[in-house]
Amino acid sequence: MHPTPPTAQPAPLHKGAAALSHPVHLRVNGTDHALHIEPWVSLLDLLRDRLNLTCTKKGCDHGQCGACTVLVDGERVLSCLTLGVMRDGCDVTTVEGLASLSLPASATQQDAGAAVPASATSSAPQAAVATLPLHPLQQAFMQHDAFQCGYCTPGQLCSAVGLINEGEARTVDEVRELMSGNLCRCGAYPQITAAVCQVALGIDHARSRTAHERVTTGTVPA
């Protein structure tokens, strides 16, 4: 009798990081990247530590604050909860690449990319703003002063672009609800809502509020 061959056993895991890395191909902000990453590396850490795209912020690192929001194939995702190896072959856009995007044809909008009105700023800053290659939402955020410390702004912008791509926001209240996953510690929610509404809905919400809707100083809207 011939002895029964031993059952094939999986190769033992090596301690070296190279043995655990996986090839990943990503297109990030229009540039193709061929990477080898460990299976536990989040998309957030990949972007910040491997590609040096540090505008995407690490806030809570638990998917609760929205600061790490990026666009993957046009959809907003929390990059701190997304493993890099699971996005192999995807198209990723961070805030650094927003200027290269165009708005969906279905989105009704004002010309948020136009220069800021003279009443809002002096002529010199206005000229500088007008020449910057910015996405309409970035222009609207500047026009409405929709940031203070700016830490949450990259995630707010990417989330707002994703909101427009989804095409589900039809009212100001729906914009508020669909942006509620992005927190602003400085409390700039009225300005953020106004900026997103200008581009997504084509209305100047900051000027169209009724007296009842106006925000009382020292409060944060729901």
Which residue stretches match the model-derived regions?
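Signature of N-terminal electron-transfer/Fe-S-associated modules in redox systems
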Residues: M1-A222
